[in-house]
Each structure stands twice: as structure tokens, then as C-alpha cells.
From Swiss-Prot:
<feature type="binding site">
    <location>
        <begin position="142"/>
        <end position="143"/>
    </location>
    <ligand>
        <name>NAD(+)</name>
    </ligand>
</feature>
<comment type="similarity">
    <text>Belongs to the NAD kinase family.</text>
</comment>
<dbReference type="GO" id="GO:0003951">
    <property type="term" value="F:NAD+ kinase activity"/>
</dbReference>
<feature type="binding site">
    <location>
        <position position="153"/>
    </location>
    <ligand>
        <name>NAD(+)</name>
    </ligand>
</feature>
<feature type="active site" description="Proton acceptor">
    <location>
        <position position="68"/>
    </location>
</feature>
<comment type="function">
    <text>Involved in the regulation of the intracellular balance of NAD and NADP, and is a key enzyme in the biosynthesis of NADP. Catalyzes specifically the phosphorylation on 2'-hydroxyl of the adenosine moiety of NAD to yield NADP.</text>
</comment>
<keyword id="KW-0547">Nucleotide-binding</keyword>
<dbReference type="InterPro" id="IPR017437">
    <property type="entry name" value="ATP-NAD_kinase_PpnK-typ_C"/>
</dbReference>
<dbReference type="GO" id="GO:0005524">
    <property type="term" value="F:ATP binding"/>
</dbReference>
<dbReference type="GO" id="GO:0006741">
    <property type="term" value="P:NADP biosynthetic process"/>
</dbReference>
<feature type="binding site">
    <location>
        <begin position="68"/>
        <end position="69"/>
    </location>
    <ligand>
        <name>NAD(+)</name>
    </ligand>
</feature>
<dbReference type="GO" id="GO:0046872">
    <property type="term" value="F:metal ion binding"/>
</dbReference>
<dbReference type="GO" id="GO:0019674">
    <property type="term" value="P:NAD metabolic process"/>
</dbReference>
<dbReference type="Pfam" id="PF01513">
    <property type="entry name" value="NAD_kinase"/>
</dbReference>
<keyword id="KW-0520">NAD</keyword>
<keyword id="KW-0963">Cytoplasm</keyword>
<dbReference type="InterPro" id="IPR016064">
    <property type="entry name" value="NAD/diacylglycerol_kinase_sf"/>
</dbReference>
Amino acid sequence: MNTIGLVVNSSKGDVAKPVREVISWLAEQRIKVLYNEESAVLLGCPEEGISTRELGAQCDCIMVWGGDGTLLNCARQTASSGTPIFGVNLGRLGFLTEIDIPDLRERLQALIAGHFYIEERMMLEATVIRGGQVVDQAVCLNDAVVSKGASFRMVQLRILVNNEFVGSFAADGVIVASPTGSTAYSLAAGGPIISPDMEAMLITPICPHSLSNRPIVISPQSKVEVQVLPYVDKVGLNLDGQYGLPLREGDRILINRATVKARFLKIQKTGFYDVLREKLKEWQNGLD
């Protein structure tokens, strides 16, 4: 482990001091640290920043300071390089960010000593076809969501799986999620929880007008097609709640398992069900 990339969500409070301390400690261990652009600005050296995508190409692993959202963004941008990432938690307990700042130095010592393993997560690829032409294509880790956005009107959608008609319905939208994404928006919309070590896809309608429209778990080899039917107001595609694209009547959105995977560097054995149990307690008790 010679070079570590650094991605910091600078909106998560005053983190510059602990970040600098970790960088200094890594330098003592002869570990080189590269920064993405936002992190370089935070540290007062904007000229040294490179894109997160470039970090993936130049580093052995990437250390992400933030919450699950920051980690999702990094996973999308570095998926093509296959560089493993790990999260330092700056907020509430997350499903993906597993290291707290007080434990970080101990975990980094284990990392440098080679005491880690790589956990791979299935990703999705979404392709937007308009007038027979591909107008956008991107990968996501959690979910691809076709929804009405800020409009008050429902959208009319048609769903096919492997070119087989599943159904048409009026709803606020539809979520196509990975197992990792099953504990995100899909769960709030009534979808089931899928263990992240499985490979599957999940189709979850968002507030459908009919009670007969239920979530469906399908094979990871499946190809999902969402068609935007006439008489829609405003509808858009959103990936991981971060990357968005306005859609038009007649657009076809194709969603399938991506050829790349998110790779998480695990320094400690954290059980998914331990984290799930704590998150469910948190949601039950409400947020402060």
C-alpha cells in the first residue's frame, strides 16, 4: 500500500484538523496521499487537487470521509478503475461508512500491515434511449429512480423485464434497486431488504395508484425497461439520489447489472445484520 487517495465531504463540519493529522501520520509511514479537488481546497492546496476519477487511476485505495452519500458518489466515479474504497464516518451510523475517527489510526495500521479484505457489491447501469438514440448512460450502486420530481401529478409508466410486459401503472415513480440499494429509497417505498452479498434486482413502485402493484425481486441477469407513457408532466431519472436527467414522453430507460462492481476495502469484520439492527432502531426512535 503505497498511495492512498483522499475524498472529504467538507460540508460535514470542521474536519480539516483530523484530516491533516492523518495525512501527517501516513507520511511518517511513507504513504503518499493524493487529494481530490474538494479535499485539496479544504486543506488549502487547491493546485494539488485532481478529479475523483483520476484518484481511482493513480491510488491503491481511496479513503472517503463523509456519509454513505459521499461514498456512493465516490463508488460511481471510481468503479471503472476497480480501486477499492473505504469510509470514515462523519455522521450517523451508515451502511457503507464503517470507521469512526477515534478508531482510524488503528484501522490504518491494520491496512498497512495487509490485514484487510475486499468486498464487492453489484452495481446497476442505466441507459436512456430517445428517438432510437442513446442520450445518456451511467452506473449507480444503490438505485435508478424514474419519478415525477416536484410535480403534483402522477406519472404513467410501463415496465418490461427481458422484453416481457410486466405492467403499466400510475404512480409517483418506480425504483430499480440493487441489493445495496434495498435498504435505501426502496425500503422507504415498501420494498424488501436483500442481503448485500446476493446478486439480484428489485423493482419497487413508488406510491402506485393501485394496491396490486407490488415490489418484485428479479434475477441479476434481467434487463428492465421503463417506458415513459404520454400525458406526463415532469419526470426524471435519478441515480443514487445524486445524478439526474430530465426525461421526455416516449423515452425508454434500460436498467441492467453493470459490468463493473463497487469494491469496498474492509479492515474490520462488520456484520451487515448488526448494522441493519442499529439502523432500524435509529429509524424507530426518530432522528434528532
